Regions:
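Zinc-dependent metallohydrolase catalytic domains
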Residues: 4-27, 31-45, 299, 310, ...
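Short active-site segment of divalent metal-dependent hydrolases/proteases
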Residues: 372, 376-377
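Alpha-helical packing segments of well-folded alpha/beta enzyme cores
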Residues: 183-187, 371, 438
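Contiguous, non-catalytic segments that form substrate-binding/exosite surfaces or channel walls
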Residues: 20, 26-148, 158, 166-362, ...
């Protein structure tokens, strides 16, 4: 459509017989579609539809034969339809949509768990797989350029097994083979420009992984990536985050290229170097902490390109615990994502008396929060494991004492178990919550605020450091209210891991008592809902409440105590009638559109690279995609 009208949408309005308002509604949809790389929100996993009628969309499509053909092909997938379950990503057996389980509407949650657990027992990692149900069993589709990699190149020599119930499990290579082949080719070309041996090894292992489907090769690429310290241009690619798989273990493809912001990185560097003195301030003893804090790379980046369904504000990867515990990890704060603002952005739920402080300090408060979340949040803690039969990474004769019970621990990770396999679909949100709570606890340390340029390191709620701390707590409380947008009353499930976590932290603030935090309103419909948070009580009421919650989150994770963790987390993230019937409705009325990011393109001309930027508008978003090459 864009090519047909050459970007002149007022002309296409006349051609299609539509008003400019109707065309603008289509453009809003198109920009959101491109920003989320699909018609389900990347942050919320619910379907969004155009605000124009199907007949109006068809009128737009009739302007050319090509657009009409595409419309006829996809028209049934664009709008809501009668099947409400299809409005959400989730398990197919619950009536939801998931492309991780293609052509398998009858595959059950138990079958997915059974196949996944079986493959885990064989040592096959799941991130680059999908599962398809067949008459006699299951096909496990492995993303790879080759449809028949040699047994030596595969992670498992065998590729077919029979389960106890007689059903067959077969590995089928070559999923997304065209895309994986193109990606591997470009990775091999990029290797020619590697700056050092770590980058060369990284490219070689990427290529092996994308050609053969080997995630062991991908893990080697991530080890090399971690060891490549402080590059000027930072990049990583692969099946990394598992938020969108309803089972919580299969990855979504993403890749990014970004440049280092040296000034901001310096502040994060100070945080890295002083991290070992702050970890002991968290509410557990050394038994539940890594033997040695592996000092990670902590970099503030300006994103050039982030290819994926959504762009985070910070990243802490790789997610493989053995690499994290033995080689470390990288923390990345994405500065130009943190500070990006849409024109005339509204800030609901903040009192007028707090607004000036909030607007002035929300960016620095968020930067401190992201730094602590990524570095110390995801970076701290130890999983207590039986690493191989009879071998433990803790003193088994005198087991650690749980601060929750005052007794020796009774659970730990068994051989072959990982954090992800034990906690499953709970893992993503639970770990985000743990990291957020670490950040909320340690943002109360005034020497940390001084590292970022606020205050003199002494505890003082009345100076600029106090402003940043107060804003950080307000920001989290506000995020907890806004989170209700991402909870679905029909399925009674949370559509977004971070938002479920933030709601639980708001509940933790409120549980600390009205002396600390309270939701206030005068109107019956809560249209004037605001947060009252007592600045002077953060240190003596707010932080202890966070510490108590964080201690449970951490100890349950460290000891593989899934049952207690799930019971606690389900309870605190349960949306009670007051929140469902009143607060959520107020949130939806004040809902602000989710940001989509218009990204620049790079074009090579005669050996030189030209940067093309676009305006922050729907048209700019579409134009940027029109001028981009695709796999």
């Amino acid at each position: 459509l864009h090519k047909h009208c050459k970007g002149d949408y007022s002309a296409i309005a006349k051609e299609a017989g539509l008003s400019q308002e109707e065309v603008d509604a289509y453009l809003n949809y198109a920009a959101q579609f491109l920003g989320n790389l699909g018609n389900y929100k990347s942050f919320g996993d619910s379907k969004f539809i155009p605000r124009i009628e199907p007949r109006q969309l068809k009128a737009l499509a009739t302007v050319s034969k090509e657009t009409l053909g595409l419309y006829e092909k996809f028209k049934d997938a664009v709008y809501a339809g009668e099947d409400l379950g299809k409005l959400h990503l989730g398990y197919p057996s619950a009536g939801h949509v998931s492309t991780y389980y293609p052509d398998s509407p009858t595959i059950t949650k138990e079958e997915i768990a059974g196949v996944s657990d079986f493959l885990e027992s064989k040592g096959l990692l799941p991130e680059n797989t999908r599962i398809s149900k067949t008459d006699g069993g299951f096909k496990v589709l492995v993303a790879s350029a080759s449809s028949d990699p040699s047994p030596e190149d595969r992670d498992l020599k065998d590729n077919e097994w029979t389960l106890e119930d007689g059903k067959k499990v077969q590995l089928v290579f070559g999923d997304y083979s065209k895309e994986m082949d193109t990606i591997a080719h470009h990775i091999e070309e990029a290797k020619k420009y590697a700056a050092n041996d770590n980058e060369r090894e990284m490219m070689e292992e990427y290529s092996k992984s994308f050609r053969t489907g080997s995630l062991e090769a991908f893990k080697r690429s991530q080890k090399a990536w971690v060891l490549d310290k402080g590059p000027q241009v930072e990049s990583d690619i692969g099946f990394i985050e598992t938020y969108r798989d309803p089972h919580g273990i299969r990855g979504e493809w993403e890749g990014f290229v970004a440049m280092v912001n040296k000034e901001r990185t310096q502040a994060f560097g100070k945080l890295v170097s002083t991290a070992p003195q702050y970890i002991p301030l968290l509410p557990w003893d050394a038994s539940f902490e890594k033997d040695k804090f592996l000092s990670p790379d902590f970099t503030s980046l300006e994103v050039l390109t982030f290819a994926g369904s959504g762009i985070p504000a910070g990243i802490n990867i790789p997610n493989y615990d053995d690499i994290r515990q033995n080689f470390g990890f990288k923390n990345v704060s994405l500065g130009n994502i943190l500070s990006a603002k849409a024109p005339n952005e509204q800030i609901p739920f903040i009192k007028d008396s707090d607004l000036a402080t909030y607007q002035k300090y929300r960016d620095p408060a968020f930067e401190v929060q992201v730094g602590l979340h990524e570095l110390l949040g995801h970076g701290c803690g130890k999983l207590l494991q039986e690493t191989s039969p009879g071998q433990y990474n803790f003193d088994f004769a005198q087991k650690p004492i749980s601060p929750l019970s005052g007794q020796e621990i009774k659970t730990w990770y068994k051989p072959g178990q990982t954090w992800g396999s034990v906690f499953g679909s709970l893992a993503a949100s639970y770990e985000e919550c743990r990291a957020e709570c670490v950040a909320m606890a340690l943002s109360c340390e005034f020497p940390i605020l001084e590292l970022f340029g606020f205050g003199d390191g002494s505890a003082n709620m009345d100076n600029e450091a106090g402003d940043v701390l107060y804003t950080a707590y307000l920001q989290m409380a506000r995020a907890g209210i806004a989170a209700l947008e991402f909870w679905d009353p029909k399925s009674r499930k949370w559509g977004q891991a971070h938002m479920q976590a933030r709601f639980s932290i708001l509940r933790t603030f409120l549980n600390a008592g009205v002396e600390f935090c309270q939701l206030e309103w005068e109107k019956d419909d809560l249209s004037d809902l605001t947060i009252r948070l007592e600045r002077k009580r953060i240190l003596d009421l707010g932080r202890p409440a966070v510490d108590e919650y964080l201690q449970k989150l951490h100890i349950y994770k460290a000891t593989a105590d899934f049952e207690r963790a799930k019971r606690m987390y389900d309870e605190i993230t349960d949306v009670e009638p007051f929140y469902e019937n009143y607060v959520r409705k107020a949130v939806l009325k004040k809902k602000t559109p989710r940001k989509v990011f218009v990204q620049a393109n790079t074009v090579e001309k005669e050996g030189k690279v030209e940067l093309r930027e676009y305006e922050a508008s729907n048209g700019g978003m579409i134009q940027s995609y029109v001028e981009r090459e695709y796999v």
